[in-house]
Amino acid sequence: MWQRITVVAGTVPPRQSHYTFRYEPMFELLPPLNDHNLPWMDTIHPIVVHFVIAMGLITFVFDCIGIFARKPALFEVSFWNLLFATAAIFVAIIFGQVEAGLANPYGASSDILNLHSTIGWSLAGILSAMSAWRYVIRSKDPKQLPLPFLGAGGLLSALIVVQVTLGNQLIWVYGLHTVKVVEAMRAGLV
């Protein structure tokens, strides 16, 4: 990303450009980084992602209760939870990618962060596909839910739990974006 291009006219050999381009990075437009190595007060990704976690897991819970307790009204609730989880995961990913880029991972945290990012994007695709599938199911008969969809919801829930575990490791084991780790990195200790 570049702020501007400065064109300097000059004499150059024939058949070459008459202009020299100088690129200046746009980093000077960003606010300074704080104690957490972020341009804003604290990490936003974990705040947004908690909505995705809650809505993704409660969707499966409502589907199970709806099927086994024969309460089809819960299918409508789980559909809307799934839809909002799908929208929210993209917001979580955007903030997660920015914050991951500013994290300066070290050691094994780099591999965990890469896996966490990959699974996050995969979850976005899976949630989108499941929302579309659920919309088709709901359009045909809103009071029925096929067991294969319930199985897919169970696998989605398991993947969410794995993703939560990886995110917890990044914060509670490796301390990415915590003040002490950022201070140690800035001092060259990590």
Task: Give a label for each model feature.
Residues 5-25:
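Short, Lys/Arg-enriched N-terminal segments with co-localized hydrophobic residues
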Residues 19-190:
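Polytopic transmembrane helical bundles with strong interfacial aromatic enrichment
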